[in-house]
C-alpha cells in the first residue's frame, strides 16, 4: 500500500487525516514541527490499532528538511503516492497596518513556500515523467482566501490565496503525469488554530454567521480529504472544495 505524507499531522485536521487513512490500511508519515509528544502519541495510537505510521520532524520552510522528510518516509514506509499539506501558521489576529514584516515572512514561508516545496518533492517521486506511479495531492487552503479575512488576518488569507493559485497551476502542469492536485477550503473548524491566534472565543463568536450555525469538525474536513486522495474522484483535479457550512 503506497504511503501518504501528512504535514501538520500532530493535531487538528492533519491528525484526523492520519487516523482515517491508517484505518484504511494506508501507511502514514505524520509530520510535525515542534509537538513531538502529540505526533508520537498519534503514531502509537495508529500502530496499536494495527496500522503503520512514523512521526517525522521537519521545518517545511527549509528545503533540506523537506527533502529529508520525503526521503525518510519513502525509505521507512514505502513509495509515496499521497500528500496532504495541512501544516500552516496564522499569526496573531490583527489589521494590516499592525502586521510586522517578520510575521508576514513566517506566514508565507510556511503556508506558501512550505506547501510548494512539499509538492515539488511529491511530484519528483510520484510523476510518471520521473518514473513514478502517480498519486494525489491535497492542499489545505481556507475560505479566508475568498472572503479576505478583513479585520482579522488578511495576511493569512493572502497566503491561502497563493495556495489556491498554486493548486490550479500545478494540477494542470502534472495532469498527464498521473498526479491529481486539489485543495480543500475549510471555513471555521473547531481546532486550536483560533486560540493560537489569540481568539479562544472565536468559534462561539462566529458561529451565528455560519448558515449551519456551527463550526465544522476536523473529521468532516478529513473525510473530504480522504475522498480526494482515493481513486473515487479519478477525473477531479484542479478543484478547490469549500467546506464551510454554507458561509
Which residues does each predicted region cover?
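Short, small/polar-rich loop/turn modules that mediate ligand/substrate recognition or access, typified
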Residues: 78, 175, 180, 236-238
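Residue(s) in the substrate-gating loop at a strand-loop-helix junction
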Residues: 142
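Alpha-helical segment proximal to the catalytic Tyr-Lys
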Residues: 124, 172-173, 234
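Catalytic Tyr-X3-Lys loop
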Residues: 81, 97-116, 138, 163, ...
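C-terminal substrate-recognition "lid" of short-chain dehydrogenase/reductases
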Residues: 214-243
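Active-site helix of classical SDR
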Residues: 119, 159
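Conserved glycine-rich cofactor-binding loop
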Residues: 10-11
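Active-site Tyr-X3-Lys motif and surrounding loop/helix of classical short-chain dehydrogenase/reductase
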Residues: 68-75, 94-98, 102-109, 201, ...
Amino acid at each position: 500500500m503506497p504511503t501518504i505524507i501528512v504535514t501538520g499531522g500532530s493535531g487538528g485536521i492533519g491528525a484526523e487525516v492520519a487516523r482515517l487513512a491508517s484505518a484504511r490500511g494506508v501507511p502514514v508519515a505524520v509530520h510535525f514541527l515542534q509537538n513531538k509528544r502529540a505526533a508520537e502519541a498519534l503514531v502509537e495510537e495508529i500502530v496499536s490499532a494495527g496500522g503503520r505510521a512514523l512521526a517525522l520532524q521537519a521545518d517545511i520552510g527549509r528545503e533540506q528538511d523537506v527533502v529529508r522528510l520525503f526521503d525518510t518516509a519513502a525509505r521507512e514506509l514505502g513509495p509515496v503516492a499521497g500528500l496532504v499539506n495541512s501544516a500552516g501558521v496564522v499569526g496573531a489576529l490583527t489589521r494590516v497596518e499592525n502586521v510586522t514584516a517578520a510575521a508576514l515572512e513566517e506566514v508565507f514561508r510556511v503556508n506558501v513556500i512550505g506547501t510548494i516545496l512539499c509538492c515539488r518533492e511529491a511530484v519528483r517521486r510520484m510523476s510518471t515523467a520521473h518514473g513514478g506511479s502517480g498519486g494525489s495531492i491535497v492542499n489545505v487552503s481556507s475560505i479566508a482566501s475568498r472572503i479576505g479575512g478583513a479585520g482579522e488576518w488578511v495576511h493569512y488569507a493572502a497566503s491561502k490565496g497563493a495556495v489556491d493559485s498554486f493548486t490550479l497551476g500545478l494540477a494542470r502542469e502534472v495532469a498527464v503525469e498521473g498526479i491529481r492536485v486539489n485543495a480543500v477550503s475549510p471555513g471555521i473548524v473547531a481546532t486550536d488554530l483560533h486560540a493560537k491566534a489569540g481568539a479562544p472565543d472565536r468559534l462561539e463568536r462566529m458561529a451565528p454567521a455560519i448558515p449551519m450555525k456551527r463550526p465544522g469538525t476536523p473529521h468532516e474536513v478529513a473525510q473530504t480529504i480522504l475522498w480526494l486522495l482515493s481513486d473515487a474522484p479519478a477525473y477531479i483535479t484542479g478543484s478547490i472544495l469549500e467546506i464551510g457550512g454554507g458561509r
